[in-house]
Amino acid sequence: FINFFDGFRTSHEIQKIEIWDYEDLKPLVDMDAVKAFRKNALNPDAPVTRGTAENPDVYFQHREASNKFYLNVPDVVEHYMNEVNKLAGTNYQLFNYHGAPDATDVVVTMGSSAQVVESTVDYLNKLGRKVGFINVHLFRPFATDRLLKALPKTVERIAVLDRTKEPGALAEPLFLDVQAAVVDGGRNVKVIAGRYGLSSKDVIPADIVAVFDNLAADNGKKFFTLGINDDVTFLSLDRAEGVEVETPGLTECKFWGFGSDGTVGANKSAIKIIGDHTDMYAQAYF
């Protein structure tokens, strides 16, 4: 498995996190299996020669023989997500749905955009709009049955947000998987594709409202971008106006300063004091 983060964002951020106690983690880990795995590692103390080539008469068969292991991965991940949920009181699923139970318009995304989409969905639900979003927690292997199970039966339109660009391809990976899953499941649903966040370009609630507006429009863009002004291929969506997404108990501050005037240092000290000496959650981005 690969867990990946935005390197620039995480290197310019201070955030308060909750840490698990190792005693709580122990029941989730089969240490005998870990030891057996490590014994197979290549190292000078246990040298071994392994086949460096495989003839074409058997290579294809061996590649296909591994299918069952990949097919079992969703069940294994789901099992351990449920174990984590029991210990931490969380609700991790392979595909988490959030929003109106009878939503007609849904955004599917994963990673850094998930929280802003969730807060925007709550904002639009309060305004009476039947919208929702699906947060993808397991991208590979892609569990089509779990996605279709998470998707409300009332959904008519889906917007998929990818944080990557695949020049020359028909579209980006998550969009292609979601579209194939919807077709495979026999669902008559419109699916469109958006790109966001390249080089940490910000996406705000006004962008997500624009996604839902574009999704519901009769002449909306099938392929679009967020957070930029594309005056070359004209794929970008204009940010919606008048969007005020409020989170109860949240205080936000923005500071301006000149280089070396101490603004960054003072804010780093302040956010660390708040995080270390209060029960409040604290986050800072520089």
Predicted regions and their residues:
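Short acidic, glycine/serine/threonine-rich loops at helix termini
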Residues: H12-I19, E118-T120, T144-R146, A169-P173, ...
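Anionic-ligand anchoring segments at beta-strand to alpha-helix junctions in alpha/beta enzyme folds, i.e.
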Residues: L87, P101, V106-H137, T251-F286
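Glycine-/acidic-rich phosphate or pyrophosphate-binding loops and their flanking alpha/beta elements
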Residues: N82-D105, E118, S236-E252
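Glycine-rich, anion-gripping cofactor-binding loops and their flanking helix/strand elements
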Residues: T104-V106, A114, E118, Y123-K126, ...
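Glycine-rich beta-alpha junction loops
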Residues: F5-H12, G111-S113, T164-K165, R195-S200, ...
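Conformationally flexible catalytic loops at phosphate/diphosphate-handling active centers
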Residues: I2-N96
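Peripheral docking tails and interdomain loops at the edges
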Residues: R157-E246
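Conserved anion/nucleotide-ligand pocket segment
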Residues: F1-I19, E246-G259, G265
